[in-house]
């Protein structure tokens, strides 16, 4: 009788373990499926032309020592806010191949600033520079960083933007195992933070611009949310 009870207990335990594993597996697959299905609008996607690519080669040669246009195994996601009122302004800025009206960084090269993603105030995510290519957005890190621009002003971004940032970060982390750090633009030149070990700048005269975007409160919320999601600590810098 004892043997029968013991066998029954073992059988039930195994079934419960299998059931729990199945549920966990389904949840994991479901989450991965949602990540793959993230809606990204390609309306403002820019396919770099020869002029932009040549200017980008000049920029990367000057600052990183190699004329490279491709973003391989990105290690950082940089969160920005545009410090502008609407999407149209930003799209018109990024569509130019040449840098215009930026006397603060014109010494660094002629290629225009850019971003990989733009998130509007309603939370809609737009692709801009294709992920295959480097974009000019953060001094010292463009060679290894993905840029996410949020329409609006530091620490005054919308709840819809916050939610879309979380979704996009999860999507990118799932896409690239190489990603180690997520930083706010205002943190880029803080050499006390772990991401700074990736800093690369050959031009010692290139002046670091002071940034406040996207705001400390916004970044703190992102990090708290990602911690709950279960990402590793090094993502929080």
Which residues are covered by each model-predicted region?
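Basic/polar, cationic surfaces and motifs that engage anionic cell-wall
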Residues: 19-53, 154-237
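Solvent-exposed, acidic/flexible segments
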Residues: 70-72, 110, 141, 154-165
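Classical Sec-dependent N-terminal signal peptides that target proteins to the secretory pathway
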Residues: 1-20
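Cell-envelope and extracellular/periplasmic
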Residues: 82-83, 141-155
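Structural preference for beta-strand elements that scaffold enzyme active sites
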Residues: 76, 145-147, 181
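Second-shell loop/turn segments in exported
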Residues: 64-66, 114-115, 150-159
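N-terminal catalytic cores of peptidoglycan-degrading enzymes
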Residues: 19-138
């Amino acid at each position: 009788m004892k043997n029968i009870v013991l066998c029954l207990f073992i059988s039930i335990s195994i079934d419960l373990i299998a059931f729990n594993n199945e549920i966990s597996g389904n949840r994991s697959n479901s989450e991965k499926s949602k990540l793959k299905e993230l809606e990204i609008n390609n309306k403002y996607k820019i396919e770099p032309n020869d002029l932009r690519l040549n200017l980008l080669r000049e920029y990367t040669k000057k600052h990183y020592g190699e004329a490279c246009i491709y973003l391989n195994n990105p290690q950082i996601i940089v969160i920005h806010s545009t410090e502008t009122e609407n999407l149209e302004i930003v799209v018109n800025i990024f569509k130019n191949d040449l840098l215009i009206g930026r006397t603060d960084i014109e010494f660094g090269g002629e290629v225009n600033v850019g971003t990989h993603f733009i998130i509007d105030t309603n939370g809609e995510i737009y692709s801009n520079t294709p992920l295959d290519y480097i974009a000019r957005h953060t001094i010292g890190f463009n060679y290894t960083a993905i840029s996410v621009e949020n329409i609006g002003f530091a620490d005054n971004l919308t709840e819809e933007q916050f939610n879309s940032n979380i979704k996009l970060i999860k999507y990118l982390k799932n896409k690239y195992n190489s990603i180690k750090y997520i930083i706010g633009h205002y943190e880029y030149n803080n050499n006390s933070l772990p991401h700074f070990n990736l800093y690369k700048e050959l031009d010692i005269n290139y002046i670091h611009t002071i940034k406040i975007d996207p705001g400390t409160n916004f970044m703190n919320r992102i990090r708290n949310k990602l911690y709950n999601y279960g990402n590793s600590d090094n993502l929080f810098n």
